[in-house]
């Protein structure tokens, strides 16, 4: 009754107006699952490859080849298989592609099918996706890491670091966390406007003011937290995504906005100093993706008290994560479903992290859609943290709204991760 009977993939647009892949998977009993695939602006060199068409259409960014792969070759390989056999289906697609980075069929085609299969199977079983994937123990609502000031590749301003985030650890529920975040977001808007800064929002819904340094951005956020009636370090903590690979040139970190260039050791010391001076509990991609020595230095300096998240470093890849664990590098992994390309491999990365006492953070991409699958996956994996942008843009809010619905559905079972995510 839950055998796959049809796959219909199509080209739709993401939040940046670029094409992406959406897939519908139909089952014998009439159940249907739909998934849309996100894409990133700052991408790690070791990520799975999203297949783009090239040529003039959509300035080379069309995804008709990936759509065709899903509709024909992938369907021919998995049609008739029971959708509940997720691992088997994902492995068939990996083998069918035959490349180490899914570049032949495209990670965008493979992931769209993988997630749609899971959603169809969940519908057939009469369960919400988080319960179908995570089982009876899936009840932990994640602390949202809300990106309210953007820099780097996500904004046209001088700030070197890509994201400055607030984490409402003092909330009692996800609904309260979203309210607290919204209040700080709108307070920050007023503060920026009052000092003559632009309050347009970037790809992920955060502001992109013409500030020059990380401390300047952090000071604005600290003041806004207090003006909104909250206590920094108690009600609200801070997080950074440095995206350091973007400004790592010739073995050095070139902070153009701050007008200085740092050696690897000095960069690690700078980040440790920021974490000591502000209530920063999480730093993502503090060092460049292949600067393993720099990562080790940063981990030794700040890893006991600060969550050090590998995004470009690990690219949701269990093999790279195991390398990091063996070397004592970082202590957390960012989980982006399209970095690895199947649900099975995504869950494996989270499990690998948890077994090594590393944390995992479920994450969106800068190019998103209204698809809210990652909200369910955050709860399914009990990972306790989610990055899904700011408190504006419906492509970001779709995930927050889904978390609110999940919390309501769980009722008294629901637990909010809150301060349990803080290290040290």
From Swiss-Prot:
Keyword Cytoplasm: yes
Record gene name: eno
Domain of life, per lineage: Bacteria
Documented EC number(s): 4.2.1.11
Cofactor: Mg(2+)
MF GO annotations: magnesium ion binding; phosphopyruvate hydratase activity
Family statement: Belongs to the enolase family.
GO cellular component terms, semicolon-separated: cell surface; extracellular region; phosphopyruvate hydratase complex
Pathway the protein acts in: Carbohydrate degradation; glycolysis; pyruvate from D-glyceraldehyde 3-phosphate: step 4/5
Organism lineage string: Bacteria, Pseudomonadati, Pseudomonadota, Alphaproteobacteria, Hyphomicrobiales
Function as written in the Swiss-Prot or TrEMBL entry: Catalyzes the reversible conversion of 2-phosphoglycerate (2-PG) into phosphoenolpyruvate (PEP). It is essential for the degradation of carbohydrates via glycolysis.
Chain sites annotated for binding (2R)-2-phosphoglycerate: 162, 336, 365-366, 387
First-level EC class: lyase
Co-factor remark: Binds a second Mg(2+) ion via substrate during catalysis.
Active site: 204, 336
UniProt: Mg(2+) binding residues: 241, 284, 311
Keyword presence, Manganese: no
Record's catalysed reaction(s): (2R)-2-phosphoglycerate = phosphoenolpyruvate + H2O
UniProt GO BP: glycolytic process
Keywords, ordered alphabetically: Cytoplasm, Glycolysis, Lyase, Magnesium, Metal-binding, Secreted
Subcellular location field: Cytoplasm; Secreted; Cell surface
Protein name according to UniProt: Enolase
